[in-house]
């Protein structure tokens, strides 16, 4: 089926259900960022493979919303279809809610799968439709169309595993007790744990159910006297089932969550996070007494304990060795005049990571973007879209690994030949932004909103900006994007020691260039004085930053010192694990810069 045929099939299904339109989001029952293939309907229907998008189909038009990371990619992937691409957040572009209000009339109905839409968003759409006398109905008409083609992936059924306290620093019982303490503070007695990363953190549960994210499709239900894991039968070994039982955890089938909620006593008080709860489950929870608030697990898992931090540091040493060896391979291949494509870059990098102990998969699909392709922040080479690396300009490589001791995310932008003056200027500004974020010292009440400006200052000075956050939290053997902390203009979360964050400013000029430099950082205690409690960042990523493009005279003394100190630290941490040739290469790349 073509994209337009799939859209037509949605119209027929909506009409047969007595409705006038269909909405599909990139979401699942767990409000996940990366979806199990079984739930990832939007790319199949639209042809757009980016994240955080919404498709609306009415009887006479269709539109898809994407954020600033994907404008260029969406325009390309939707070309030739009837779907109108909506650049969310751009001037003059309506929000999804505004569009629904404009395109639905009195008595008309919009269908969506309530189990795959966050409650807060479903309620927003209900309100928008109500303004015109229209309504929303929770009904999944997309799945039968997809199922009938035989192209829909099955739900995962492989064996899960439990991480050990030596990896995580805590048992399931320890973490259940932490959650119960937070429920008491909130005046609640029960929590429906829906996020796969939250279930994974709570019970030390891991699997291979999502691409690049080692989590299991499951729910958990915590009350003051019980904890239940809802997961497909047969997915845990007898030994792991017994380990969970020792922590007071019982097992039920994955589909039984809503029935279990309905069966609880009427006086059970649920702490409900509308943003993290699908609409179908939300309706079941609100049949009980509720207290509105964030799922406490988000904040708890955002602060890594000492065992996790020790493992994360080891993880970055291993990853640093792999990436340094890749850098050597890349430099050698280019010097020999070998023709490399963007997909070749991904293959070379995966090969080096696979040599590392404890590595088991990438933490996201590698972005290897040559030249103007890098202006698309989340570009992916595939099929015919796979540029050859030419001997000029930049190659941007953004990737990461999943290890048995942590999760990594790193971006480097490599010069692969002569550069223009503009490319050198842009690179230097991005480096300055990266450094200013990394060397920030701040009081312990600062939020991601406040800290974001540390990085934007150097690019803003030249009236340049990037349409995304500066950084995101990173999970522990979990999702590479993890909250609640982030570095972005609208994040109110206060930073605390033990949080990890990426530092990844960039410049993206369509049809010209894309540059990003990314390290992971650990938020650390910097001491107290009469002015308060101070925090800062320590680098976790241990990979040299290309210095050839840098306009050294534009760096401040503090910025230059930071760069030289960082490279000295990289050499100190990695050299014991390298052979003599590798040490010599790394020493050259980490040599201090001077004016």
Segment roles from a protein language model:
Residues 1-595:
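Active-site neighborhoods and metal-handling regions in enzymes and metal-associated proteins
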């Amino acid at each position: 089926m073509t994209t337009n045929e799939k859209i037509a099939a949605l119209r027929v299904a909506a009409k047969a259900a007595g409705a006038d339109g269909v909405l599909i989001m990139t979401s699942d029952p767990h409000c996940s960022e990366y979806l199990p293939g079984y739930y990832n309907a939007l790319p199949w229907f639209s042809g757009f493979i980016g994240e955080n998008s919404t498709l609306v189909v009415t009887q006479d038009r269709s539109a898809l919303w994407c954020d600033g990371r994907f404008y260029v990619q969406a325009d390309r992937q939707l070309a030739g279809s009837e779907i109108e691409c909506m650049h969310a957040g751009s001037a003059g572009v309506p929000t999804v809610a505004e569009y629904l209000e404009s395109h639905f009339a009195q008595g008309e109905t919009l269908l969506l799968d309530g189990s795959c839409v966050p409650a807060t968003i479903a309620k927003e759409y209900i309100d928008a439709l109500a303004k015109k006398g229209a309504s929303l109905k929770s009904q999944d008409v997309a799945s039968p169309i997809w199922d009938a083609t035989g192209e829909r992936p099955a739900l995962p059924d492989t064996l899960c595993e439990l991480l050990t306290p030596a990896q995580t620093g805590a048992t399931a019982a320890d973490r259940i007790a932490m959650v119960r303490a937070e429920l008491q503070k909130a005046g609640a007695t029960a929590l429906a744990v829906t996020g796969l990363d939250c279930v994974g953190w709570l019970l030390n549960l891991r699997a291979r159910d999502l691409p690049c994210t080692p989590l299991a499709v499951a729910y958990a239900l915590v009350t003051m006297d019980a904890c239940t894991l809802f997961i497909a039968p047969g997915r845990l070994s007898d030994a792991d089932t017994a380990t969970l039982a020792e922590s007071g955890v019982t097992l039920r089938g994955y589909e039984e969550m809503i029935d279990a909620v309905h069966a609880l006593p009427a006086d059970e008080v649920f702490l409900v996070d509308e943003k993290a709860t699908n609409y179908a489950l939300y309706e079941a929870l609100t049949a009980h007494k509720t207290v509105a608030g964030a799922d406490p697990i988000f904040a708890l898992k955002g602060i890594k304990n000492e065992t996790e931090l020790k493992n994360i540091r080891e993880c970055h040493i291993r990853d640093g060795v792999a990436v340094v060896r890749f850098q050597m391979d890349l430099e050698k291949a280019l010097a020999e005049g070998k023709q490399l494509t963007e997909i070749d870059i991904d293959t070379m990098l995966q090969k080096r990571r696979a040599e590392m102990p404890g590595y088991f998969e990438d933490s996201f699909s590698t972005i290897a973007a040559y030249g103007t392709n890098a202006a698309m922040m989340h570009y992916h080479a595939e099929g015919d879209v796979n540029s050859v690396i030419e001997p000029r300009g930049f190659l941007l490589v953004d990737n990461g690994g999943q290890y048995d001791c942590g999760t990594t995310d790193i971006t480097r932008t490599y010069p692969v030949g002569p550069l223009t003056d503009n490319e050198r200027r842009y690179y230097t500004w991005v480096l300055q932004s990266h450094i200013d974020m990394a060397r920030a010292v701040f009081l312990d009440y600062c939020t991601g909103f406040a800290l974001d400006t540390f990085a934007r200052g150097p690019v803003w000075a030249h009236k340049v900006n990037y349409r995304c956050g500066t950084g995101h939290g990173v999970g522990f053997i979990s999702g590479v994007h993890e909250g609640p902390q982030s570095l972005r203009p609208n994040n109110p979360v206060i930073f605390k020691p033990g949080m990890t964050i990426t530092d990844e400013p960039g410049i993206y000029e369509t049809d010209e260039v894309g540059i990003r430099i990314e390290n992971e950082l650990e938020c650390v205690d910097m001491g107290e004085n009469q002015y308060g409690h101070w925090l800062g960042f320590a680098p976790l990523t241990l990979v040299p930053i290309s210095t050839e493009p840098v306009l050294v005279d534009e760096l401040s003394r503090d910025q230059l010192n930071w760069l030289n100190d960082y490279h000295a630290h990289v050499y100190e941490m990695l050299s014991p694990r390298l052979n003599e040739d590798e040490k010599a290469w790394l020493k050259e790349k980490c040599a201090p810069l001077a004016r």
